[in-house]
Amino acid sequence: RSRIRTSISAIAIAVAIIAVVFARGLISGMIDSTFENHINYKAGHIRVIDKEYKLKERLFSLNYVLDGFNGEGTSIMIEKLKQVEGVKQVVPRLKFGAVVSMEDELVGMMGWGVDPAEEIAFTRIDEKIIEGRMVELGSREIVMGTGLLEKIDRVVGDKVTILYTTPFGSFKGSTFQIVGKVQSAIQMLDDTIFYLPLDQAQRILEMPGEVTELLLITSNQYKAASILPGLNALFSQEDKTGKYILQVWNKDYELIGLFEIVTKIYNFVYIFIILLACFVLVNTLIMIVNERTREIGMMSALGLSSREILYLFTMEGAIIGVIGSAIGTVLGGILTKVFSVVGIDYTAAMEGMSGG
């Protein structure tokens, strides 16, 4: 019976360790993936925007944009930002709302005017293009997400006329050739986003030298805040209007702050699971001791002290714990590795949520 209870204790500990290792791997992976997408498609490591744009970003406002320090253009601004210690890359983007007219409906979408070279270096978007290629500066061409192409019934090689509104209120249309199809890990982006060369976006929107945001990239995302003093010094010297603000990826976004709180909560859950497994082990040892009172009496008669007898039972519990932990760690690691390669399909769970 002691062997059965010992085995049950080892199995309980192993199961607890497997649960902790797998859950921690799964949740950490999901959070890291969320952080990566947030950085790539939203915030960079530090984002430079107009302070008014922050309030009207959801409206795709083009009235509060970056036009450089004191209106000198973003090209000079980018060069000055690159000179700040710690800034490895500056990624410009010009985001705007647009529509494509179908027979009986208007399909809404969002255009991203980008520098192809900078975008490839930052987000590796070329690896996500499953057909065709990335856009090139100076060319009237676009890359669309897989879902968006299906919505407008187009394929790579077709031309499409996109309707949009300029900052001056003019409603215009421009025709582009579709040169690539992109499929990212975020279905909502694939259903709504198209990329075009930054110079073409600035031309059609009548916004020469202007962008909606600049993403600053550092060598370590978790140390991005350390370069703020240098950036603040530059902006205090160059930005006389004081209209620009700096947003750090993990400090100025409420959602990311919530994820950090969730991580701490899960750490307490992991500890609680381990404590439950320890309780099973302690309970088993108590039952073993109660069943072996005669054996304990014989050990006392042979001259073993109470401390030595306690030591023997403690070592027995430690061995059970080590064996269970080792088995759980190995199996949990294997399980986590398998799912990290195979992945988990959330399509059914997320069905109907992508349109938000």
Model-derived segments and spans:
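Hydrophobic alpha-helical transmembrane segments of multi-pass inner-membrane transport and secretion
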Residues: 4-30, 260-295, 318-330
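Hydrophobic, regular-secondary-structure patches
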Residues: 24-110, 133, 138
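Short acidic/glycine-enriched loop/turn elements at secondary-structure junctions
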Residues: 76-177, 203-205
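Basic-flanked hydrophobic alpha-helices used for secretion and membrane insertion
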Residues: 133, 147, 154-239
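Short coil/turn motifs that cap or connect alpha-helices
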Residues: 155, 305-306
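Peri-transmembrane interface segments
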Residues: 220-279, 288-290, 299, 312
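Short helix-loop junctions at transmembrane helix boundaries
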Residues: 327-356
